[in-house]
Curated annotation (Swiss-Prot):
Keywords: Activator, Developmental protein, Differentiation, Nucleus, Repressor, Transcription, Transcription regulation. Residues 138-205 are annotated as: Disordered. It is found in: Nucleus. Transmembrane segments: none annotated. The lineage of its organism: Eukaryota, Metazoa, Chordata, Craniata, Vertebrata. This is Cbp/p300-interacting transactivator 2. It comes from Bos taurus. The gene is CITED2. It holds the Pfam family CITED. Interacts (via C-terminus) with SMAD2. Interacts (via C-terminus) with SMAD3 (via MH2 domain). Interacts with LHX2 (via LIM domains). Interacts with WT1. Interacts (via C-terminus) with EP300 (via CH1 domain); the interaction is stimulated in response to hypoxia. Interacts with PPARA. Interacts (via C-terminus) with TFAP2A, TFAP2B and TFAP2C. Belongs to the CITED family.
Amino acid sequence: MADHMMAMNHGRFPDGTNGLHHHPAHRMGMGQFPSPHHHQQQQPQHAFNALMGEHIHYGASNMNASSGIRHAMGPGTVNGGHPPSALAPAARFNNSQFMGPPVASQGGSLPASMQLQKLNNQYFNHHPYPHNHYMPDLHPAAGHQMNGTNQHFRDCNPKHSGGSSTPGGSGGSSTPGGSAGTSGGGAGSSNSGGGSGGGSSSNMPASVAHVPAAVLPPNVIDTDFIDEEVLMSLVIEMGLDRIKELPELWLGQNEFDFMTDFVCKQQPSRVSC
């Protein structure tokens, strides 16, 4: 291995006869510049090495491995065994395509953050404020919340707004900055100041952000209460009214034991030996 490195160093460094190639940093090519003369000679070759280094890298290594010749083998292998792109690591990385990804990542972080912001706005539109689009119909005075801090939430999904046609309006208002106009739904009408946006003619506090589920329209999925008659019919059909314990308590046991106990409790007149 040492002979191989020495032979490559004789072909690599032009000042190999003055003993500089015996230095470990110069021998391995680990320094930023192996020597001043070597840097001056390799400086015009940086463009060639950056362009042709990746294409000749494997070819030069294979030729050297097969033929055993460690010196120059053509215009592409002027460094004698090393691929032309195998300069000092700092010199190679500063003049090749390796500087591209950091710059691209800095430029690409902005669209990625914008996409995340868009997704976050859509997420927060549905989860922390799930009933904002029903508030203008139920509580007209609470419609000013759509104009304040939650303006961008309403702008993300305009279909949830109360029917405004201009930016800044909510409920039924048609003027920019209006807090809440006349809203339908049997909730009455209230005209509050457009400049302040905090005027309220309702007794309900304006800071209420969540409307109770009981006052929401019945078509909301959260307010689809199960009918007691339907529930009792299911209980009677399954025979749950004839047993003393619910079947959920038996789910941790074996399926066979559960089925036998369940059948025995459903048929109390059955004689079991």
